[in-house]
Amino acid sequence: KTDTTKHQYVKFNNNGVYMQIVNEGSGEKLKKGETATVLCRFDETNLLTDTIQLTNRALAWDGMVDKMMVTNTSGTFTATFDASSSVMKRAYRNTMVPSGWLVPLTYINLGRIAKPDDKLAHVRLIVPSSQGHKHASDNVYACFYDITYQRGV
C-alpha cells in the first residue's frame, strides 16, 4: 500500500503506469470470469500543459458518471465505455477505456456505499501516452488521473 502523505506511487515496469491507492474501497475484487458495470468519477490532467483537460466532477457533468463494462479474463481486464453515459466517450469519440485505467482493478475492491463506513475505491494514476486514450497516444502526452471506482447495478 502506498503512503499518500509521502506522495508515494508504485511504478509498473511492464506498462509505465504509476499508481497510488488512496483507498482500496469496500466490496470485493472483480472475480476471474466476471463482467461488471463499473462507475467512475475522474479528473484528467494533461501533464504536458499542466491543465485539467477533462472531468466529470464539474457541475456541467454532475449527473453523468463514466460507466464502463469491465471483464476479467483470467486476470486480464478489458473494458468499454457506455456510449450513453461517458464523458470520456463524448470528449474523445471512442468507447475504448484507456489501458491505464484498468491497472488498478487487480488491487482495488468494487462495491457500493451501503453503510456509513463504506468507501469507494480511489486511486491516482500517471498514465503514459502508450496506455492512455487515442488523443493522448496520437499527440504523445501523459495524463494524471484522480479516479474513484464503484460497482454499478
Model feature map: region roles:
Residues K1-V153:
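Cross-family detector of peptidyl-prolyl cis-trans isomerase
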